[in-house]
């Protein structure tokens, strides 16, 4: 009985200590509608509307009907990630959903960005960061004319 009380006290102490320090968030740990913001190793989940450090903009490059693909309509987009900070963005994770209907799963349908198996987009190895007040653009071709839903999951600076 005494050892159970000691164990419970120890677990309660650990729980209290863990709750009083900022926890390390990542691209998978924040709730829907939140962004994991990591500033010099200190991380927290914030509402997506409060994340002014980075912005995504979508521009239509062109739309066409492809007869060789069953007369399907495709649209090419440029997606620009803009760093609004006075410091470099070290890493960014961008969420996608069912609206990212790539023309095919090749480098001809998405470029200048890494598409992970789980559908998350990250910076390519040749672009390890985005400089202060700079932008980085990647492109994609999707089926239809509706742009893909893209949301920042995590940003580290």
From Swiss-Prot:
GO BP terms, alphabetized: cell differentiation; extracellular matrix organization; sporulation resulting in formation of a cellular spore
Keyword annotations from UniProtKB, A to Z: Developmental protein, Differentiation, Secreted, Signal, Sporulation
Residues annotated as signal peptide: 1-19
The UniProt record lists the keyword Nucleotide-binding: no
Location within or outside the cell: Secreted
Transmembrane segments: none
Disulfide bonds: none
GO CC, alphabetical: extracellular matrix; extracellular region
GO MF term list: extracellular matrix structural constituent; hydrolase activity, hydrolyzing O-glycosyl compounds; polysaccharide binding
Keyword Signal: yes
Protein name: Stalk-specific protein B
Organism listed in the record: Dictyostelium discoideum
Gene behind this protein: staB
């Amino acid at each position: 009985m005494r050892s159970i009380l000691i164990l419970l006290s120890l677990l309660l102490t650990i729980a209290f200590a863990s709750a009083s320090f900022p926890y390390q968030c990542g691209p998978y740990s924040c709730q829907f509608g939140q962004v994991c913001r990591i500033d010099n190793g200190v991380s927290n989940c914030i509402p997506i509307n409060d994340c002014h450090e980075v912005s995504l903009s979508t521009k239509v490059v062109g739309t066409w009907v492809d007869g060789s693909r069953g007369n399907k309509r495709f649209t090419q987009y440029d997606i620009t990630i803009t760093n609004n900070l006075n410091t470099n963005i070290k890493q960014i994770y961008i969420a996608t959903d069912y609206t990212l209907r790539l023309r095919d799963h090749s480098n001809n349908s998405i470029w200048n960005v890494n598409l992970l198996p789980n559908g998350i987009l990250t910076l390519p190895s040749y672009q390890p960061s985005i400089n202060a007040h700079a932008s980085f653009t990647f492109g994609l071709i999707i089926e239809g004319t509706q742009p893909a839903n893209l949301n920042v999951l995590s940003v580290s600076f």
